[in-house]
């Protein structure tokens, strides 16, 4: 599905550069930092925090509920935690696992750990049992820090004080530390608030975090984030792109175990020496109240967050806020302008980058409907959707797509853009492509389909696993979702491919959440036929009160694909499109059986 109207032209870049001219000082600062950070010269998150605490000690570093910490206070807090960790034997290269919901203690624990050269394993507090145990096994922590709100989650795994005598378990309220746990706050009392000497020795090439994949398609993998990548993100996305000022406040309701919070949001804040307002979790109903409460001038988004806000009823207060810019990824082109206009957002800094990726794209010039550009080596290559792998030509090498076309994004692995990979070496190797354009070259397979917009800009289209083939054509689920979401009454649409007996490829199916109880199958079919090629129109629909997502707003498609369109297995309304004029009709068990026998043409 092409979208030639979203190409980037020279005039767009010229306008973007002119808009950025008044802030060239911040841009130059970021450029200078990008140039000066070297893998083998001391520089780290801890040193950056200490630098701000020394230069601007009374500046507010963190807001949470009614609480406030200056940079001097927050740095001292992190130092006391570092002293506790050191007393328990933590040193450079060790892992400190953190299992808490969003609260200031998470950031203080992270800062304390990385100041020692240790690695913070950012556990997903939604995980339970075997999955959580798998995450802990991958990272082999010396210490596990558990918030009181996560005790049930931790003790559902094999890693807890009742069964594990190898590790030390620290507890941070609410409530008194249970048997087997040591009280972190009690142990902090009396510890020195001075900067640890170890911080001076931490090198950018050392790991700082383990960030876990969402696990929507299997067990999570632990991707490695180094200080080098974090610092480059701070400089490139924070200082060069967002260009926050010391008196700015960025609101982040995203989970701190995710890079959009820990690297993008916190990195941008530390890059400017401004304030982070931390939300407990995202709530569409409370979002703008929190923005006004903290006088936030920026916020970070991910995935469907913007759509959730746009789906809320419009109010006269929609523009009563101080937000001038937002940063994130996953804002769909079809709602970009509507969101920007309704809420009066001056600049949207969309970016592209995965936790394990070796480079990122940033929308430095504030252009519309783009994930931005990247100066580092990348290519967009032809992709075989049926085989789900890049297509090699007769000479064995890959071929680039033309401007305006969609292909697989691959990025070259070099000394300046290293691939840090996962803790699992086999999983790391599986993400690499070799002999791509010449013998011996190595490229990272992002697993994402993007559109070449020209001038080194890209637009995200789909995850590889979310693209399917039907009637000999490739169907990008996100573009079908865009057409569905444009239909009145549809609040959420999740599109995926399902197997049909006797048919090649996969037929399109959509799981929908609609406002009210009415559903006009004929009108929806007409709308989709006008918006999409015939092969891309979903043949099956499933109505749900609400779509299931991960904690980072990624739709859980695996279960939907597995369930298919069998009314005997699904207790929610199902529809099928057998006649384009008649529209969608109820999928009965009799119709399902006829489809299974190949009696109905789809």
Listing of model-derived features with the role each one plays in the protein:
Residues 27, 151-204, 376-381:
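ANL superfamily adenylate-forming
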Residues 37-50, 58-103, 107-111, 128-133, ...:
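Conserved AMP-binding/adenylate-forming core of the ANL superfamily
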Residues 57, 176, 189-212, 219, ...:
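Conserved pre-ATP/AMP-binding loop-to-beta segment of ANL
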Residues 70-72, 208-232:
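Conserved AMP-binding A3 loop
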Residues 106, 127-134, 144-146, 353, ...:
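AMP-binding/adenylate-forming catalytic core of the ANL superfamily
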Residues 186, 271, 293-301, 310-384, ...:
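Gly/Ser/Thr-rich phosphate-binding loop
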Residues 231-249, 259-297:
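Conserved AMP-binding/adenylation subdomain of ANL enzymes
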Residues 532-555, 572-601:
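AMP-binding/adenylate-forming catalytic domain of the ANL superfamily
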């Amino acid at each position: 599905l092409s979208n030639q109207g979203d190409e980037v032209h020279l005039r767009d870049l010229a306008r973007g550069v002119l808009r950025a001219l008044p802030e060239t000082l911040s841009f130059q600062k970021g450029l200078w930092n990008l140039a000066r950070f070297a893998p083998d010269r001391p520089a780290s998150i801890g040193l950056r925090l200490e630098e701000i605490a020394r230069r601007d000690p009374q500046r507010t570093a963190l807001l949470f509920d009614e609480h406030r910490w200056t940079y001097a206070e927050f740095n001292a807090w992190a130092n006391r935690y570092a002293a506790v960790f050191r007393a328990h034997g933590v040193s450079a290269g060790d892992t400190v696992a953190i299992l808490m919901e969003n609260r200031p203690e998470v950031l203080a624990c992270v800062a304390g750990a990385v100041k020692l050269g240790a690695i913070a394993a950012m556990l997903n507090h939604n995980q339970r049992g075997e999955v959580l145990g798998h995450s802990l096994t991958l990272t082999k922590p010396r210490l596990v820090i558990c918030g009181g709100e996560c005790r049930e989650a931790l003790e559902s795994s094999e890693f807890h004080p009742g069964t594990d005598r190898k590790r030390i378990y620290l507890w941070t309220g609410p409530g008194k530390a249970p048997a087997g746990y040591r009280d972190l706050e009690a142990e902090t009392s009396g510890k020195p608030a001075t900067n640890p000497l170890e911080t001076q020795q931490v090198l950018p090439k050392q790991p700082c975090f383990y960030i876990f994949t969402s696990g929507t398609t299997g067990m999570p993998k632990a991707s490695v984030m180094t200080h080098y990548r974090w610092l480059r993100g701070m400089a490139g996305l924070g200082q060069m792109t967002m260009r926050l000022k010391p008196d700015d406040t960025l609101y982040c309701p995203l989970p701190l175990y995710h890079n959009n919070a820990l690297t993008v949001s916190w990195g941008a804040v530390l890059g400017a020496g401004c304030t982070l307002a931390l939300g407990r979790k995202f709530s569409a109903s409370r979002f703008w109240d929190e923005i006004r409460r903290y006088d936030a001038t920026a916020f970070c988004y991910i995935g469907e967050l913007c759509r959730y806000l746009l789906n809320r009823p419009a109010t006269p207060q929609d523009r009563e806020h101080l937000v001038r810019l937002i940063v994130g990824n996953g804002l769909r082109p079809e709602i970009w302008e509507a969101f920007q206009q309704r809420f009066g957002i001056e600049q949207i800094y969309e970016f592209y980058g995965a936790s394990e990726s070796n480079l990122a794209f940033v929308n430095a010039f504030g252009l519309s409907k783009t994930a931005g550009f990247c100066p580092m080596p990348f290519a967009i290559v032809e992709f075989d959707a049926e085989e789900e792998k890049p297509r090699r030509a007769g000479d064995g090498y890959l071929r680039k797509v033309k401007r305006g076309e969609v292909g697989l994004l691959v990025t070259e692995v070099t000394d300046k853009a290293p691939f840090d990979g996962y803790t699992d070496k086999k999983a790391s190797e599986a993400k690499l492509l070799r002999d791509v354009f010449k013998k011996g070259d190595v490229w990272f397979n992002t697993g994402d389909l993007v559109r070449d917009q020209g001038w080194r800009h890209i637009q995200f289209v789909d995850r590889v696993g979310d693209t399917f083939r039907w009637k000999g054509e490739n169907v990008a689920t996100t573009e079908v979702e865009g057409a569905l979401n444009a239909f009145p009454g549809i609040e959420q649409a999740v599109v995926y491919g399902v197997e049909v007996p006797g048919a090649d490829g996969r037929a399109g199916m959509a799981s929908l959440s609609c406002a009210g109880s009415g559903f006009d199958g004929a009108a929806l079919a007409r709308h989709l036929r006008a918006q999409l090629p015939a092969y891309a129109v979903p043949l099956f629909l499933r109505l749900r009160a609400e779509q299931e997502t991960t904690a980072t707003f990624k739709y859980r498609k695996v279960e939907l694909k597995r369930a298919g369109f069998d009314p005997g297995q699904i207790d929610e309304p199902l529809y099928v499109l057998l006649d384009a004029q008649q529209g969608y009709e109820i999928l009965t068990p009799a119709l399902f059986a006829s489809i299974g026998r190949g009696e109905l043409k789809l």
